């Protein structure tokens, strides 16, 4: 009963997940350290009876706090259960079946999976020799007719950081939507991040 593009898919295989307890798993963005004492203190005062009920379906209080922190309208804030859900939402929102998603190679391995689920086509361009975005990236993406272009910044696995000015130029040059995946942004100390 499933759609033909789903029936032809291979299962998604995540990266290595060492369970030895001594590895720091940066590929899953996990923190190897315990929470700060301030977090532990805040959790101790948390009303645990709230754990038995569902949160606000629209996450209004959280969205409002995020909007105020970033100086934007609450309508500009979408809260998801995790980053992968946000990526899925972007693909299903911006890319029609038969459409095109673009990225670089290498990139996050979930992009092609989400693209295939959507019944779309993935177009990738190799990074430049120094792991930066190729100079003709926007031209290649536009020629492919991409509705959504995904750029990981900082790039995984290289750690290459794309300057904000380069990303701003890319937004102006692209004919589709630019998604900047900042899953590892908290690890950047580069100025302009």
Language-model regions: role of each:
Residues 93-114, 128:
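Conserved PLP-anchoring active-site segment centered on the Schiff-base-forming lysine
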Residues 34-36, 87-88, 111-112, 158-159, ...:
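Glycine/Thr-rich phosphate-binding loops of Rossmann-like dinucleotide-binding domains
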